[in-house]
Amino acid sequence: MTYKTSDLSIAAYLMMKGMKLLDATRAHNGQFMFEFDDPNGKGVQLAIEFTGSECAVYDNHVRNLKKILYRN
């Protein structure tokens, strides 16, 4: 069983939680796809857990800082 996500932040969180990255690709349209080994079916649960974590708060601050830097 595998878990796939196109969200870079969730992918990093899953790696931090010990999930093994099997593949990382970039489509012609620029979209990323990360595939993880998920033998216990915990990918969805961990992705939901990410939304309420300190990691999500950090990620949001990084995004806001990028908006400030790249505003033109």
Model-derived segments and spans:
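Acidic, low-complexity, intrinsically disordered interaction modules
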Residues: R26-E35, P39-V44
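N-terminal acidic leader/helix
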Residues: M1-H28
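Aromatic side chains
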Residues: Y3, Y13, F32-F36, F50, ...
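Acidic-enriched, low-complexity/disordered segments with a strong bias for Aspartate over Glutamate
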Residues: D7, D23, D37-D38, D59
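C-terminal basic regulatory modules in eukaryotic proteins
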Residues: P39, G43-N72
